[in-house]
């Protein structure tokens, strides 16, 4: 009978440890470790690369979102300063209108006739308003007519959105003017920020209720930005930057047309133009080189085949020249009727 002494026990432990070590390190004892046949290890190596790519994509996505939210917050902060300056300017303008005639100030203020028309229209809306929230909504209709067109892009806008990623904010600078007008009509030119926020929240509820009646038609939808490709990398980058500012293809068309045909819209001559010559109806054809630029920018962004995109793009160009919605004042009666109900 073997008597285990402390020395024997220590020797036994050392022998067993060496045997186990040799067994693990020996390729013949563990053939799965062979690199040529270790498919599991290879699989994990591939997954790690894919995982890294996914993480990079997520990181880029969140960085872009963070950048967008930061820019929105900066705009909101700038709008607060703008509100105070605009209010002082509005009060001075009202005093000037009361003490002088339009003829007297025509030479001193550029575009005074347009400003006077705007002032006259918004005053007419304010006079018949009985509710601050309805007045604010009516002024949104008046100041953002292009958002309430056939593409229903207003669906994606809010005054105080719960999510700055999901919804866009109406121009804070135009909202400042609306706030000043509401304050003047209902609050004797005084309205604290929390009260204005309550009014904005009520307007957002009205927008939500109206949004439930509509959807953005497929023809007005845009491709995801990562799927947009131009003729070159430079073109692709430029188009993506344009699309990033739009929510529908109609809005993209409008943005490009206002850049390329700015003089026509500024002078009012746009009324005489259409996509093609139309002698019978007295319309002049638009510059074909500029129209080609419109197609090159818009078509890659539409989620349809190029031939279909070309037809739709042409229709949107004609539609916009028939009724350019960015020109405010055309829907004055609609706004007055809304607040009068």
Curated annotation (Swiss-Prot):
Induction remark: Expressed in the early phase of the viral replicative cycle.
Membrane topology: Single-pass membrane protein
Cell compartment(s), UniProt: Host cytoplasm; Host nucleus; Membrane
First-listed, main subcellular location of the protein, grouped into a coarse class: host cell
Effect on the protein of changing residue 209 to V: In strain: Harvey and Somalia
A single BP term in Gene Ontology: symbiont-mediated suppression of host innate immune response
Domain BEN: 112-222, 233-328
Key words of the record: Early protein, Host cytoplasm, Host nucleus, Host-virus interaction, Inhibition of host innate immune response by virus, Inhibition of host RLR pathway by virus, Membrane, Repeat, Transmembrane, Transmembrane helix, Viral immunoevasion
Transmembrane parts of this sequence: 7-25
Family label: Belongs to the orthopoxvirus OPG067 family.
Record's protein name: Protein OPG067
Species of the source: Variola virus
